[in-house]
A protein has these predicted regions:
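Short N-terminal or domain-adjacent regulatory/targeting segments
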Residues: 94-96
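Small/polar-rich, solvent-exposed N-terminal microdomains that initiate assembly or binding
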Residues: 1-92
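Residues at beta-strand starts and edge strands
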Residues: 69-71, 109-115, 176
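Catalytic micro-motifs at enzyme active sites that drive phosphoryl/nucleotidyl and oxygen chemistry
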Residues: 60-65, 99-107, 169
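Conserved small/polar residues in nucleotide/adenosyl-binding loops
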Residues: 170-179
C-alpha cells in the first residue's frame, strides 16, 4: 500500500515482552505446620479469559478430569491507541551495529498498547499470592528494554503501566447449571 514491504515484528515482540513479565509466578500451599506442601507454577497463556472458562466448563463426561488446572493466568492485547504527546521528528539517522555505514530510518510512531492480564483461581489465597508477586514491581509503571528493530540494533525502553486489577474466583458450575 505505502511502498516497500517490511515487518520488524514490533507488536509481536511487545506481546512477548509483556508475557515474559508474568511467566515465573508461583503459588504455595502450606500445611498445618507451616511447611510448604505444594509449589505450583502458575500457567500463563496468550488468549482471552473466556476461552479458558469455556474449556473448563466443556465436560460432556462428568467423570473425566478437567484438562485445565487452576490457578492460571491469561493475557491478550486489547487496545492500540495513538499517543500524540510522544511524537517526535519523522526521520532519524542510526549508525549500523557494525559501524560501517549510516542508515536512515523512520522514527517509531508512538502508540500505547493495552493489555489485559487475567487471573483465574479456585482459592482466594491463590489470587492474593499472585497479585502480591506482581504489585511491588509497578509503581505505577515498570520499564522493560526490548530489541525492537534488530537490523539496526534499536533497543527501546517500554514503560508498562498497571492501570487496575480485577480477579476472577472460579467456582465450578453445579451439574444442574451445565445443562
Amino acid at each position: 500500500m505505502l511502498g516497500t514491504y517490511y515487518y520488524h515484528e514490533i507488536l509481536r515482540k511487545t506481546v512477548i515482552a509483556f508475557g515474559t513479565l508474568f511467566n515465573d509466578i508461583h503459588v504455595r500451599h502450606d500445611g498445618s505446620n507451616n511447611k510448604s506442601i505444594s509449589d505450583l507454577k502458575v500457567a500463563l497463556a496468550y488468549g482471552p479469559m473466556q476461552k479458558f472458562l469455556a474449556r473448563i466448563e466443556q465436560q460432556p463426561d462428568l467423570n473425566r478430569a478437567t484438562q485445565i488446572t487452576l490457578p492460571r493466568m491469561s493475557f491478550e492485547m486489547n487496545n492500540i491507541a495513538y499517543d500524540p504527546t510522544r511524537k517526535s521528528g519523522i526521520t532519524q539517522t542510526f549508525k549500523a551495529s557494525d559501524g560501517s555505514k549510516l542508515r536512515k530510518v523512520f522514527m517509531p510512531v508512538p502508540y500505547n498498547i493495552g493489555f489485559e492480564l487475567n487471573i483465574l483461581v479456585k482459592l482466594n489465597d491463590d489470587a492474593l499470592q499472585i497479585i502480591e508477586q506482581i504489585l511491588p514491581f509497578f509503581q505505577p509503571s515498570f520499564n522493560l528494554t526490548v530489541d525492537l528493530v534488530s537490523v539496526i540494533g534499536e533497543k527501546r525502553d517500554i514503560s508498562i503501566v498497571l492501570d487496575n486489577i480485577s480477579c476472577l474466583l472460579y467456582t465450578s458450575p453445579s451439574p444442574r447449571d451445565r445443562g
